[in-house]
Amino acid sequence: MINYGKQTLKDNDIKAVIKTLKNDFLTSGPKVEEFEKELIKKFGGKFCSAVNNGTSALNIIGKALGWKKNDNIVTTPLSFLATANCIVNNNATPIFSDVENENLT
Protein backbone atom coordinates (compact mmCIF):
# COMPACT_ATOMS: atom_id res chain seq x y z
CA MET A 1 0.00 0.00 0.00
CA ILE A 2 1.18 3.50 -0.78
CA ASN A 3 0.71 5.84 2.17
CA TYR A 4 -1.25 8.81 0.91
CA GLY A 5 -1.92 11.79 3.09
CA LYS A 6 0.01 10.66 6.15
CA GLN A 7 1.50 13.48 8.17
CA THR A 8 4.78 13.49 10.04
CA LEU A 9 4.87 15.41 13.31
CA LYS A 10 8.11 15.90 15.20
CA ASP A 11 8.32 16.76 18.90
CA ASN A 12 9.51 20.31 18.19
CA ASP A 13 6.48 20.84 15.89
CA ILE A 14 4.11 19.75 18.64
CA LYS A 15 5.87 21.95 21.22
CA ALA A 16 5.64 24.97 18.90
CA VAL A 17 1.90 24.43 18.40
CA ILE A 18 1.28 24.05 22.14
CA LYS A 19 3.29 27.22 22.84
CA THR A 20 1.24 29.11 20.25
CA LEU A 21 -2.06 27.77 21.61
CA LYS A 22 -1.11 29.10 25.06
CA ASN A 23 -0.37 32.55 23.60
CA ASP A 24 -2.81 35.48 23.54
CA PHE A 25 -2.99 35.29 19.73
CA LEU A 26 -4.36 32.19 18.03
CA THR A 27 -5.50 33.05 14.49
CA SER A 28 -3.40 36.15 13.92
CA GLY A 29 -0.61 38.01 15.57
CA PRO A 30 3.16 37.83 15.81
CA LYS A 31 3.54 34.12 14.95
CA VAL A 32 1.73 34.58 11.63
CA GLU A 33 3.94 37.53 10.71
CA GLU A 34 7.05 35.57 11.79
CA PHE A 35 5.94 32.62 9.64
CA GLU A 36 5.37 34.85 6.60
CA LYS A 37 8.80 36.48 7.01
CA GLU A 38 10.47 33.06 7.24
CA LEU A 39 8.75 31.95 4.01
CA ILE A 40 9.88 35.13 2.23
CA LYS A 41 13.44 34.50 3.39
CA LYS A 42 13.37 30.80 2.46
CA PHE A 43 11.92 31.28 -1.03
CA GLY A 44 13.33 34.70 -1.89
CA GLY A 45 9.99 36.38 -2.48
CA LYS A 46 8.93 39.93 -1.83
CA PHE A 47 5.53 39.23 -0.27
CA CYS A 48 3.75 36.46 1.58
CA SER A 49 0.21 36.06 2.89
CA ALA A 50 -0.49 33.04 5.06
CA VAL A 51 -4.04 31.71 4.73
CA ASN A 52 -6.12 29.37 6.87
CA ASN A 53 -5.84 26.22 4.73
CA GLY A 54 -4.80 24.70 1.42
CA THR A 55 -8.22 25.22 -0.15
CA SER A 56 -7.98 28.97 0.37
CA ALA A 57 -4.44 28.95 -1.01
CA LEU A 58 -5.54 27.09 -4.15
CA ASN A 59 -8.39 29.54 -4.76
CA ILE A 60 -5.99 32.48 -4.43
CA ILE A 61 -3.62 30.82 -6.93
CA GLY A 62 -6.45 30.61 -9.47
CA LYS A 63 -7.23 34.31 -9.01
CA ALA A 64 -3.54 35.28 -9.17
CA LEU A 65 -3.01 33.30 -12.38
CA GLY A 66 -6.13 34.83 -13.91
CA TRP A 67 -7.98 31.60 -14.69
CA LYS A 68 -11.18 32.31 -16.58
CA LYS A 69 -14.02 30.66 -18.47
CA ASN A 70 -12.81 28.34 -21.26
CA ASP A 71 -9.41 27.85 -19.58
CA ASN A 72 -8.50 24.16 -19.22
CA ILE A 73 -6.36 23.38 -16.19
CA VAL A 74 -4.62 19.97 -16.09
CA THR A 75 -4.55 18.32 -12.68
CA THR A 76 -4.30 14.89 -11.12
CA PRO A 77 -7.40 12.90 -10.16
CA LEU A 78 -5.42 11.58 -7.17
CA SER A 79 -5.91 14.56 -4.90
CA PHE A 80 -8.31 16.15 -2.49
CA LEU A 81 -11.56 17.48 -3.94
CA ALA A 82 -10.36 21.04 -3.26
CA THR A 83 -7.87 20.72 -6.12
CA ALA A 84 -10.59 20.44 -8.76
CA ASN A 85 -12.99 22.70 -6.87
CA CYS A 86 -10.60 25.66 -6.94
CA ILE A 87 -10.41 25.34 -10.72
CA VAL A 88 -14.21 25.30 -11.03
CA ASN A 89 -14.55 28.14 -8.47
CA ASN A 90 -12.34 30.24 -10.75
CA ASN A 91 -14.62 29.45 -13.74
CA ALA A 92 -12.06 27.22 -15.47
CA THR A 93 -12.41 23.53 -16.38
CA PRO A 94 -10.37 20.78 -14.68
CA ILE A 95 -8.80 18.27 -17.07
CA PHE A 96 -7.69 15.12 -15.28
CA SER A 97 -4.43 13.51 -16.30
CA ASP A 98 -4.15 9.76 -15.76
CA VAL A 99 -1.90 8.24 -13.15
CA GLU A 100 -0.02 4.95 -13.26
CA ASN A 101 -1.72 2.17 -11.27
CA GLU A 102 1.61 0.71 -10.14
CA ASN A 103 3.00 3.77 -8.38
CA LEU A 104 0.26 6.43 -8.57
CA THR A 105 2.44 8.91 -10.46
Task: List where the protein language model places each region.
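Conserved PLP-binding active-site segment in aminotransferase class I/II-type PLP enzymes
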Residues: 1-64, 68-69, 89-90
